Curated annotation (Swiss-Prot):
This is Large ribosomal subunit protein bL21. Belongs to the bacterial ribosomal protein bL21 family. The gene is rplU. Part of the 50S ribosomal subunit. Contacts protein L20. It comes from the Bacteria. One of its GO terms (cellular component) is ribonucleoprotein complex. HAMAP family: Ribosomal_bL21 (MF_01363). Keywords: Ribonucleoprotein, Ribosomal protein, RNA-binding, rRNA-binding. This protein binds to 23S rRNA in the presence of protein L20. Pfam families: Ribosomal_L21p (PF00829).
Length: 103
């Protein structure tokens, strides 16, 4: 069984037992999180697609860790004007362990 969930402005295809990295969630490590924004649920050849959400469906997950992705380097330059700007960014994430999918 799998589900397509929406969290942090992105969509993820998840199944029970998987680990995924999502945008940072305000939850402690070890805490259980319920994601109720389920866009689709599939079980073999049977697929249930919501308009836009599947009513009554939810995904339970446990917070495994918090961290930061690799650094992204930004470099801006204006040719012939002696202007250079360097900047870096590390996006924070939360790693989730999918426990169960309820449809």
């Amino acid at each position: 069984m799998y589900a397509v969930i929406k969290t942090g402005g992105k969509q993820y295809r998840v199944a029970a037992g998987e680990k995924i990295k999502v945008e940072q969630i305000a939850a402690d490590v070890g805490q259980e999180v319920v994601i109720d924004q389920v866009l689709a649920v599939g079980n073999g050849a049977e697929i249930k697609v919501g308009t836009p959400l599947v009513s009554g469906a939810s995904v339970k997950a446990t917070v495994v860790a918090h961290g930061k992705h690799d650094k992204v380097h930004i470099f801006k330059m204006r040719r012939r004007k002696h202007y250079q700007k360097r900047q870096g960014h590390r996006q924070q994430f939360t790693e989730l362990q999918i426990v169960a999918i309820a449809a």
